[in-house]
Design a protein with these regions (language model features):
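Active-site-proximal helices and loops of the catalytic beta/alpha 8
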Residues: 206, 212, 222-303, 333, ...
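Hydrophobic faces of well-ordered beta-strands that scaffold small-molecule active sites
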Residues: 38-40, 71-73, 141-143, 219, ...
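Substrate-binding/active-site clefts of carbohydrate-active enzymes
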Residues: 21-40, 45-55, 60-69, 75-214, ...
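Short, solvent-exposed turn/loop segments enriched in Gly/Ser/Thr/Pro and often Arg
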Residues: 72-81, 144-154, 222-228, 250-255, ...
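Carbohydrate-interacting/catalytic domains
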Residues: 18-43, 48-72, 78, 323-324, ...
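Soluble or luminal CAZymes and related metallo-dependent hydrolases
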Residues: 52-55, 122-126, 198-203, 227, ...
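Bacterial Sec-dependent N-terminal signal peptides
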Residues: 1-23
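Active-site clefts of carbohydrate-active enzymes
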Residues: 299-321
Length: 470
């Protein structure tokens, strides 16, 4: 009898140990991977006509052409039906026509169950196949997590109302802007109460579930600046006991780096690029931003740079709408500057319409100029030391042009160097650059001789150069 009890105890220990640690059959994500990575935001609903995991999985091997090493999945969980939103901001419950109501699928960020799969995309086996396929192709998968709020039919609403923020009448409320005391407008969600430690522990358990059972490689934390950093410190510490992970914060909050995150958004930099394209900012604002980042961030901190993402595309406009003729230059710039570049679903196929957020839509699938550009840039990011942008990034040196509309800088690491020179305006610009030698244009495969003579650039023209000889 004693032997039987001991065996049961031993098996229990082994079982629970397996729940906390998993044996990896592939090389886990590492700082070395982050140096050379391109990250891809996968909008499963809109990626294909089917809008499924299976349809996306078929294309994973093709993403290698773009240099993609990390796939960020927009939320994979089921979406609440209570207070589900329709295009235009109304609730679907306010739509009388049943057929019209059906077409509104709701916001990914109104989660009804943290441990379930949105049936719109497929099932758990389909998701496992997606992850395995990514790993087989040398890529890693992170999942978009919504820690700040849930949908209104999440089980916690009824089982643990104390886990939510409540007003003076004891009613659960949607997230409030602390600066105004008014709703953010996310009325299809219920605000979680991080003063409740039981809720925090259950959240950590749910986060562990996807790492342990599906072998995902990390998380992108939605509105991370709205959640106490101390929670992330505890959660990420626990998660990284299971396996190495990559953590992305949708925030610009330096404190989050000290609490477990590897990368944060470059929202400020992105808005500066938008303004440059509109003629409302110049190289001066770009330089100020780069210098500010150097002052605020530690050498191992880095940002995600982008010209588009799901928020920008759906709510602010397409790349062409926002950046116009500057689109190609600015796309190249986010690869050349320190950090990790992002590709959003459809960007690689010259997506030129705003994807619907609450209903089905689809991206184009014809390879054109942007695919060719991103293929070249992805290859450079993966293989050229001077493009390294993670925790041991290539250095950044600003070069003098004495023209407030022309930016020039050098990135270097070990013996590798790359030069970016760009006209950030819609007017012809002339300048002198204190650089000499023969250079190769890495995108055009042409030679260029620089000899400190006046250089002229057409509107939005740029060079991406590799030094060939003195």
């Amino acid at each position: 009898m004693m032997k039987t009890k001991n065996l049961i105890v031993l098996l229990s220990i082994l079982f629970f140990s397996c729940q906390e640690e998993i044996k990896l059959t592939y090389t886990p994500i590492s700082d070395k991977v982050l140096e050379t990575a391109v990250i891809y935001e996968a909008n499963i609903r809109q990626y294909s006509p089917e809008g499924t995991f299976k349809a996306f999985t078929k294309d994973i091997s093709g993403l290698k052409e773009l240099g993609v090493k990390i796939i960020w999945m927009m939320p994979i969980n089921p979406i609440s039906e209570i207070k589900r939103k329709a295009t235009g901001g109304s609730f679907t419950s306010e739509i009388e026509d049943k057929e019209e109501r059906k077409k509104y699928l709701g916001s990914y960020y109104s989660v009804s169950d943290y441990k379930a799969i949105n049936p719109e995309f497929g099932n758990k086996d389909d998701f496992k196949e997606l992850i395995d396929t990514a790993h087989d192709n040398g890529m890693y998968v992170i999942v978009d997590w919504v820690p700040n709020h849930t949908g209104w039919d999440h089980p916690w609403i009824t089982s643990h109302p104390e886990w939510y923020t409540q007003n003076e009448q004891g009613e659960i409320i949607d997230p409030i802007n602390p600066d105004t005391g008014k709703s953010w407008g996310w009325t299809d969600t219920a605000d979680l109460n991080y003063d409740n430690l039981d809720m925090q522990q259950e959240m950590i358990n749910d986060l562990k579930y996807w790492v342990t059972n599906f072998n995902i490689d990390g998380y992108r934390m939605d509105v991370a600046h709205k959640v106490p950093p101390v929670f992330f410190n505890e959660a990420i510490t626990e998660l990284k006991k299971i396996k190495p992970l990559f953590m992305l914060a949708e925030a610009e909050q330096q404190e989050l780096f000290r609490n477990g995150f590897d990368m944060q958004y470059a929202w400020e930099g992105h808005h500066i690029l938008n303004n440059i394209a509109k003629g409302e900012a110049s190289v001066k604002e770009f330089d100020t931003y780069i210098n500010k980042q150097k002052e605020l961030l530690e050498p191992t901190d880095f940002t995600m740079n982008f010209v588009t993402n799901h928020d920008e595309n759906s709510w602010s406009g397409t790349l062409k709408e926002r950046m116009g003729d500057a689109s190609e230059l600015l796309t190249t710039l986010v690869y050349a500057m320190p950090g990790m570049p992002l590709i959003y679903s459809g960007q690689e196929y010259d997506l030129n319409h705003r994807l619907k957020f609450f209903e089905k839509d689809s991206i184009p699938k014809t390879k054109g100029n942007t695919w060719n550009l991103l293929t070249k840039l992805g290859d450079l990011k993966n293989n050229h030391l001077a493009f390294h942008g993670g925790k041991i990034a290539a250095s950044y040196e600003r070069l003098t042009t004495e023209n407030e509309n022309v930016v020039a800088f050098k990135r270097s690491k070990e013996v590798a160097e790359v030069y970016f020179i760009g006209n950030l305006s819609n007017q012809v610009q002339s300048f002198i650059l204190d650089v000499e030698g023969t250079y190769e244009d890495l995108l055009l495969n042409k030679s260029l001789i620089l000899n400190q003579k006046k250089i002229q650039l057409a509107p939005w023209q740029y060079y991406l150069l590799n030094k060939v000889s003195p």
